[in-house]
């Protein structure tokens, strides 16, 4: 009997080979469906693939952890369909081998955040369309670089913020606000939750299945650290085979070296919805002042950097105030009386919206009933929804519609619902929140020039030095 544990052990051992033999390229899919490769096969990658598998042929998997990434994904049974058979995807440990294949149409980039920009740009340079998980980038500099690449190489590029497809909450909020039913929006409160803390995490042997040097990528070369205990995460309830505390796997989110804590983890969702709902879609729609004085971190900081390197270091409590030239104030906070979600306060009323829930007087009066299918399609950049079902009232359907939107744009043209230009504005605000919080002061931003002004130290956080061999590509 093949148990899940035995399958993972065998598959993980096989996947330890650095590079797999490159298969003979096929000019087109045997099934007529697009061919997709997933670069990054952790929890988010597998979640995305569970929806893509209904729409495309998944022909390649790549992950630097042969056990947790590759083997877990093979267990899920995704692959190329031949009648009733499923042909397993080819597996790789180096994403460059995937990009060399001329029979792959698109790639899913579901790696940790510090790898997004390099892989996404190189994928577009190789002629691939890209579905890049959120947050878009690691730094402000990367925002501009990836936007330039999308426009230069002309590939379809979708950011993995599926909340724009939530028909039962966020889309209704956008229709209300864009329709002027709340009047002029004066105040927005964005509750994204605070980051977890960790104990001191000891040095540990690097797992045999993990290429630690490759996982670190552009980030500084540091020791692998991990706790002895194993733990579940929201995305990995069945994969409790990795440490509860470490630098990688799900826990990379809580280190500024690789991510931005909740500012980028949930900020990429809720800040995005706040801006999108108000129709603020261009980088020059951004704030002019970001106040980070009310923020706390779990470890000591000096000059914006953690003074210890063996504990989670992203902000646990915060109220980051973004002030706009027109008087709008947006508070990005870890906690609010309304809970996780977005509160919009206008001159005519207010609503609070989160995943699967929207409340306010207008909602009680039944305003959502007046919105028609064409209103939702307009929010979807004119791209029709999947013809397979009219039920878009669940989160599951929203995840699917977001992937369908990407594939439809590849096949028929059009601007994806989560396009790069609007997401640069979102990512700018996410990173500015982190910089202001790390320095604990007010910083000023020039939205038109996309730069921090009057503060050389804060401006130095706009970019990072990449480790030799992992530099960002030229565009």
What are these model-predicted stretches?
Residues 1-132, 141-156:
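N-terminal glycine-/serine-/threonine-rich beta1-alpha1-beta2 phosphate-ribose binding loop
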Residues 8, 49, 96-99, 108, ...:
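Non-transmembrane alpha-helical segments in soluble domains
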Residues 15, 56, 128, 147-150, ...:
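A generic secondary-structure signal for well-formed alpha-helical elements
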Residues 48, 62-70, 76, 266, ...:
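Glycine-enriched catalytic-core subsegment of oxygenase/oxidase enzymes
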Residues 189-243, 362, 463-465:
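Core domains of carbohydrate- and sulfate-ester-processing enzymes
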Residues 213-326:
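Rossmann-like dinucleotide-binding domain that binds NAD(P)(H)
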């Amino acid at each position: 009997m093949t148990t899940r544990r035995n399958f993972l052990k065998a598959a993980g051992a096989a996947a330890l080979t650095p590079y797999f033999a490159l298969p003979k390229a096929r000019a087109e899919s045997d099934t007529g469906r697009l061919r997709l490769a997933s670069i990054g096969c952790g929890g988010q990658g597998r979640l995305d693939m569970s929806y893509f598998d209904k729409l495309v042929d998944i022909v390649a998997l790549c992950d630097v952890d042969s056990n947790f990434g590759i083997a877990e994904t093979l267990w899920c049974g995704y692959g190329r369909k031949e009648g009733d058979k499923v042909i397993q995807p080819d597996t790789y440990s180096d994403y460059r081998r995937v990009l060399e294949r001329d029979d792959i149409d698109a790639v899913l980039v579901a790696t940790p955040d510090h790898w997004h920009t390099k892989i996404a740009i190189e994928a577009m340079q190789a002629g691939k369309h890209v579905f890049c998980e959120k947050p878009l980038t690691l730094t402000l500099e990367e925002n501009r670089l990836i936007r330039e690449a999308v426009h230069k190489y002309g590939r379809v590029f979708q950011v993995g913020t599926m909340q724009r497809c939530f028909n039962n909450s966020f889309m209704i909020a956008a229709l209300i606000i864009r329709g002027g039913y709340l009047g002029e929006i004066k105040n927005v409160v964005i509750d994204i939750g605070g980051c977890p803390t960790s104990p001191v995490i000891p040095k540990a042997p690097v797992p045999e299945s993990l290429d630690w040097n490759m996982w670190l990528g552009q980030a500084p070369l540091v020791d692998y650290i991990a706790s002895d205990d194993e733990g579940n995460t929201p995305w990995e309830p069945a994969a409790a085979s990795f440490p509860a505390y470490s630098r990688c796997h799900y826990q990379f989110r809580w280190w500024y070296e690789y991510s931005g804590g909740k500012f980028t983890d949930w900020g990429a969702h809720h800040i995005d919805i706040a801006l999108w709902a108000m129709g603020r879609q261009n980088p020059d729609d951004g704030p002019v002042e970001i106040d980070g004085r009310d923020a706390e971190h779990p470890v000591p900081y000096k000059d914006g950097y953690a003074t210890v390197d063996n504990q989670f270091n992203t902000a646990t409590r915060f109220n980051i105030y973004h002030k706009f030239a027109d008087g709008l104030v947006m508070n990005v906070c870890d906690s609010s009386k309304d809970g996780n979600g977005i509160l919009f306060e206008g001159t005519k009323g207010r609503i609070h919206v989160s995943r699967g829930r929207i409340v306010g007087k207008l909602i009680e009066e039944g305003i959502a009933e007046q919105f028609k299918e064409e209103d939702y399609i307009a929010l979807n950049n004119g791209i029709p929804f999947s013809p397979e079902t009219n039920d878009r009232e669940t989160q599951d359907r929203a995840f699917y519609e977001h992937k369908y939107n990407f594939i439809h744009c590849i096949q028929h043209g059009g601007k994806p619902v989560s396009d790069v230009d609007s997401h640069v504005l979102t990512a700018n605000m996410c990173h500015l929140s982190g910089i202001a919080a790390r320095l604990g002061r007010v910083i000023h931003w020039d939205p038109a020039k996309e730069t921090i002004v009057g503060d050389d130290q804060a401006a130095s956080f706009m970019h990072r030095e990449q480790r030799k061999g992992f530099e960002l590509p030229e565009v």
